[in-house]
Regions:
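Acidic helix N-cap motif at the loop->helix transition within catalytic regions
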Residues: 53, 79-88
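C-terminal subregions of glycosyltransferases and related glycan-biosynthesis enzymes
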Residues: 3-36, 203-205, 209-212, 216, ...
Length: 352
């Protein structure tokens, strides 16, 4: 894996004027839009034509006491996502604004060109292939963040993904540097923290860098209720990438955060990297031994990076990986024995 060159503070800030300079063309009906929205929902989308309507409807169906606006950032899709967004905009011209351009601008720039055009004091995030499941999401989260000025953002549970931390009423920076515990689709953020933004790498792990930046400015309130759904599909930028690409993107994100915080949280970020390698090492049912051999090579190649930062955790990682074939074989044997036992019971009950 090649080294990463992102260094803070050399990378600098993206200012509000630079956000406005990102290529953008807006489709909206200014005369129909509400004047003072309470929440701006930012929906980044690319090649989500088959999912976009469900995402948009989950926003429009919110039971919320204040007006809302929905900004759809369409990032030059290869499919008919833009046409689908325009069709949906005609159904709710007082709410939906579409921001697009004649070229792809990337994840970070798509996010920032929506941020700088949002008008509400609170920003909710929802990507175009996910959706909200609770019609009270905005109301409950707005009530929570308005009653806690120390919160930079609030989050909730998300269906179809593992909860990597125990439920706590509040998460702080070390919590969310160690684990990716709250999903983008559950976030509600104070816009005041986004007038400028670090020029982080344009990486699929952008939300982890966003969380790190926000949690340096406040804490994260948490509602232990499922309010959104994370859709896993082969068109997703994360799941469509091979394991080497995913590990590279994760490492780039960790290095950027480590630099941004001037190495003050290297221990927490090393713990996160070990955790990522543990998840990556899980043996698939197809290509099992090829995956295991590649895992051994990958983990050994990271010795000079991981051992000095987390020696015990790294040795435990190697130990667990080394015995994976034995554990996998025992699991297969137990499955066969269980199937054989069930077959014998079925035969016994079928005989007269």
């Amino acid at each position: 894996m090649r080294p990463h060159s992102w260094v803070w503070p050399d990378a600098g800030w993206v200012t509000h004027s630079q956000m406005l300079a990102i290529p953008a063309h807006e489709f909206s009906d200014p005369g129909a839009l509400c004047v003072n929205p309470g929440v701006s929902v930012l929906m980044m989308t690319r090649n989500h034509v088959q999912y976009l309507e469900q995402a948009v409807l989950s926003v429009l169906e919110q039971s919320f006491g204040d007006p809302i606006e929905l900004l759809i950032g369409e990032d030059h899709s290869d499919d008919a996502t833009l046409q689908e967004a325009l069709r949906l905009q005609q159904k709710a011209p007082g709410i939906i604004r579409i921001i697009t351009a004649d070229r792809n601008v990337g994840i970070r720039s798509n996010f920032l060109r929506l941020v700088c055009r949002s008008r509400a004091p609170l920003i909710a995030l929802l990507e175009g292939d996910d959706y909200w499941t609770d019609p009270l999401k905005l109301q409950l989260q707005c009530d929570l963040i308005r009653s806690h000025p120390e919160y930079a953002l609030v989050a909730a549970k998300t269906a179809n993904r593992h909860q990597w931390l125990p439920d706590l009423p509040v998460y702080d920076l070390p919590h969310l540097l160690r684990r990716y515990a709250v999903h983008t689709s559950s976030l509600l953020i104070r816009r005041e923290h986004l007038h400028s933004y670090p020029c982080f790498p344009d990486n699929v792990c952008w939300e982890s860098m966003l969380l790190g930046y926000l949690l340096a400015r406040g804490t994260c309130g948490f509602l232990p209720v499922e309010m959104s759904y994370y859709r896993r599909h082969h068109g997703g930028l994360w799941h469509n990438a091979d394991r080497l690409k995913r590990l590279h993107m994760s490492r780039e994100c960790i290095d950027a955060l480590d630099s941004y915080f001037f190495r003050r949280f290297s221990k927490e970020l090393a713990d996160r990297e070990i955790w990522i390698h543990q998840m990556d090492a899980t043996l698939p049912t197809q290509g099992t031994w090829r995956h295991w051999r590649q895992t051994c090579r990958l983990q050994l190649a990271q010795a000079s990076r991981l051992f000095p930062r987390a020696p015990l955790a790294y040795l435990l990682l190697l130990s667990h990986t080394s015995v994976q074939p034995l554990l996998f074989g025992l699991q297969r044997l137990r499955c066969r024995l269980a199937l054989g036992s069930r077959w014998r019971r079925l035969r016994a009950t079928a005989l007269p």
